[in-house]
């Protein structure tokens, strides 16, 4: 029985803000691709109906952690529909590699891995569509991790179309700051009316991120990291930050630049993949 579950990072290869709804949420167009790099969740089934998170996060109550919330949500929905075997529970721990507030999707990926893994381990039998719907109640980025394929996203990120962008190599640089998403979306200078374009058009254009100008303005660490990367390769912000990345055609090129990275830049090299490492393990 599989007890080690990948919880991969994602990159937003581009991100455009196309509007703002009456409820305050921003509409967007973005391209998600996974990395062959991320956290690992260790999940051992229990038979007493309890959920235990063995690796708590400082400053976050276990019951508020997305990992526990995802487990309890699946437990509730499966139980209410008569698909939860009696006594289903789990001990969950995490090997954390992804920074919090980094724009790599760490928390959303963790939640998705819990939904997919426990659905498998508990043999609940929920479909991917059902799991993705549950995931959306936990966060806008959770469904793409549940579905496990690179995707073009619209709406608030919930309308997903599978795509297959080139699987390049990336040097990813966490600048050492956590960048709260509301800081970006509340900034009055954030571009909010980028014209909507078709997938085909966007894939042919040079990629960019509407949030980047705000992140660079508000956080000097982001600006410094991106300025350094841009000396070597096309580079952008992922999500709302704070991580930035540079793209390369080969692993060796990416690693040559990594060797020159300043000590304050805690960078790593990873490959972009269109099939999530989580779903690859399930094949």
UniProtKB/Swiss-Prot annotation:
Name by which UniProt lists this protein: 4-diphosphocytidyl-2-C-methyl-D-erythritol kinase
Family stated for the protein in its record: Belongs to the GHMP kinase family. IspE subfamily.
Subunit structure: Homodimer.
Enzyme nomenclature, EC number: 2.7.1.148
Function: Catalyzes the phosphorylation of the position 2 hydroxy group of 4-diphosphocytidyl-2C-methyl-D-erythritol.
Record-level GO BP terms: isopentenyl diphosphate biosynthetic process, methylerythritol 4-phosphate pathway; terpenoid biosynthetic process
Enzyme class: transferase
Domain of life according to the entry: Bacteria
Catalytic activity entry: 4-CDP-2-C-methyl-D-erythritol + ATP = 4-CDP-2-C-methyl-D-erythritol 2-phosphate + ADP + H(+)
High-level lineage: Bacteria, Pseudomonadati, Pseudomonadota, Gammaproteobacteria, Enterobacterales
Pathway participation: Isoprenoid biosynthesis; isopentenyl diphosphate biosynthesis via DXP pathway; isopentenyl diphosphate from 1-deoxy-D-xylulose 5-phosphate: step 3/6
Keywords of the record: ATP-binding, Isoprene biosynthesis, Kinase, Nucleotide-binding, Transferase
Entry-linked InterPro entries: GHMP_kinase_C_dom, GHMP_kinase_C_sf, GHMP_kinase_N_dom, IspE, Ribosomal_Su5_D2-typ_SF, Ribsml_uS5_D2-typ_fold_subgr
Catalytic residues as annotated in Swiss-Prot or TrEMBL: 10, 141
Gene Ontology molecular function, alphabetical: 4-(cytidine 5'-diphospho)-2-C-methyl-D-erythritol kinase activity; ATP binding
Binding site for ATP: 99-109
């Amino acid at each position: 029985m599989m007890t080690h579950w990948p919880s991969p990072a994602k990159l937003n290869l581009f991100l455009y803000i196309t509007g703002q709804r009456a409820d305050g949420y921003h509409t967007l167009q973005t391209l998600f691709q996974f990395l062959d790099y991320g956290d690992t969740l260790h999940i051992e089934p229990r038979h007493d109906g309890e959920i235990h998170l063995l690796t708590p996060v400082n400053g976050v109550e276990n019951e508020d952690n997305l990992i526990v919330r995802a487990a309890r949500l699946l437990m509730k929905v499966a139980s209410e529909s008569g698909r939860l075997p009696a006594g289903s529970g789990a001990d969950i721990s995490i090997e954390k590699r992804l920074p919090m507030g980094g724009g790599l999707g760490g928390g959303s990926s963790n939640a998705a891995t819990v939904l997919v893994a426990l659905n498998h381990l508990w043999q609940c039998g929920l479909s991917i569509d059902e799991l993705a719907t549950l995931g959306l109640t936990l966060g806008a980025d959770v469904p793409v991790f549940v579905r496990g394929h690179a995707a073009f996203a619209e709406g608030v990120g919930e309308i997903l179309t599978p795509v297959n962008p080139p699987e390049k190599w990336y040097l990813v640089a966490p600048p050492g700051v956590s960048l709260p998403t509301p800081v970006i979306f509340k900034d009055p200078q954030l571009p909010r009316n980028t014209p909507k374009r078709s997938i085909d058009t966007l894939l042919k254009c040079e990629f960019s991120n509407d949030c980047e100008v705000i992140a660079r303005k508000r956080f000097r660490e982001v600006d410094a990291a991106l300025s350094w990367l841009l000396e070597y390769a096309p580079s952008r912000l992922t999500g709302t930050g704070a991580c930035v990345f540079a793209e390369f055609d080969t692993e060796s090129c990416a690693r040559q630049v990594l060797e020159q990275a300043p000590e304050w830049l805690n960078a790593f090299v990873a490959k972009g993949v269109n099939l999530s490492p989580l779903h690859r393990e399930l094949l």
